[in-house]
Amino acid sequence: MTKKKVVIGMSGGVDSSVAAYLLKEQGYDVIGVTMQIWQEDKEYEEREGGCCSLSAVDDARRVAQKLDIPFYVLNFRDSFKRNVIDYFVDEYIQGRTPNPCIACNKYLKFDELLQKAKGIGADYVATGHYAKIEERDGRFQLIRSKDDRKDQTYALYNLTQEQLEHTLMPCGEFTKDKIREIAKEIGLDVHNKKDSEEICFIPDNNHGRYICEAAPNKVRTGNFVDKYGNVLGKHKGIVYYTIGQRKGLGLALGRPVFVTDINPVTNTVVVGPEEDIFKTDLVCKDINFISIDKLEDPMEVEAKIRYSAKPAKATISPMENGRVKVSFEDKQRAITKGQSVVFYKDDLVVGGGIIESLL
């Protein structure tokens, strides 16, 4: 019997490294691939660059050698720039706060990488994500990982049935601590490599400065205003702010104020008291459902409005033109346009969409 072939995306981190090992142990024919997506400066043009750093490629290659699996570096730079970086910059300029990891998963890892994998005769693509995929009643389900603290299903809600059928996520059955333990046991140097926290193409985490450099003619100073339109001061460009932000506003009003809205048309940033950033209802677009085909009637779920949020009780209701209304039982802090909202039923991911407006 021929072994099933799987292409695993390797970032040089501990999760994808151990995922590659686990798949090999499970009897798969494993091929390691690092997606070359980014270069910080000219040296990456001349040399073999990688996912934000040369060392990531080197780490991944060393792991592949240790596991004795073939390893390739694939160039995804143009696609990454088009689908992730340009999208990220445009969204901020429109006054929204996007999640680039979700775009990267949707367009690169589980679309283009999967197509490339199929092109070389592979049955599956695999990643080091903390999530589980199971077939139940003829439908592939995305299920929260065993490690609640590390669960990454929020960033994976766009997966289609076709993609789920051809995707493996072996880390979903383990806790992060156990994954590190396995890495140490099998002698991988990356066993104590720290988790990446920031956006991979903005290592200093300064989004505003990055967008200014990427689109200097699009970022203009403007006014801070209150909800009645009274001018309270000057801001340095709407891309520097996000809903709920309090620090770094440079306003001395004698009371704490928070960013409550961003208006790209008037180039204003609205600030107000903290209670103004608590809301219960939103509308989302670009919906993808996983556990169901489509939403016919209102459904009670738990929903997350950002990666780090706790799931909160909500009702989702179908609207016109494919949108979904989400009504939370309790007010949520700083619901942010451009972020994703993801729906859960127990451990199952029902689906999700991008927050378009607040009601």
Swiss-Prot record:
Molecular function via GO: ATP binding; tRNA binding; tRNA-uridine 2-sulfurtransferase activity
Top enzyme class: transferase
Interaction with tRNA: annotated span: 150-152, 306-307
CDD domains membership: MnmA_TRMU-like
EC numbers, comma separated: 2.8.1.13
Disulfide bonds: 104-200
SUPFAM superfamilies: Adenine nucleotide alpha hydrolases-like
Substrates-to-products reaction catalysed: S-sulfanyl-L-cysteinyl-[protein] + uridine(34) in tRNA + AH2 + ATP = 2-thiouridine(34) in tRNA + L-cysteinyl-[protein] + A + AMP + diphosphate + H(+)
Places the protein is found: Cytoplasm
Catalytic residue positions: 104 (nucleophile), 200 (cysteine persulfide intermediate)
GO biological process: tRNA wobble position uridine thiolation
Residues binding ATP, per UniProt: 9-16, 35, 128
InterPro entries, alphabetized: MnmA-like, MnmA-like_C, MnmA-like_central, MnmA-like_central_sf, Rossmann-like_a/b/a_fold
Chain's role: Catalyzes the 2-thiolation of uridine at the wobble position (U34) of tRNA, leading to the formation of s(2)U34.
Stored NCBIfam families: PRK00143.1, trmU
Designated name of the protein: tRNA-specific 2-thiouridylase MnmA
Organism ancestry: Bacteria, Bacillati, Bacillota, Clostridia, Eubacteriales
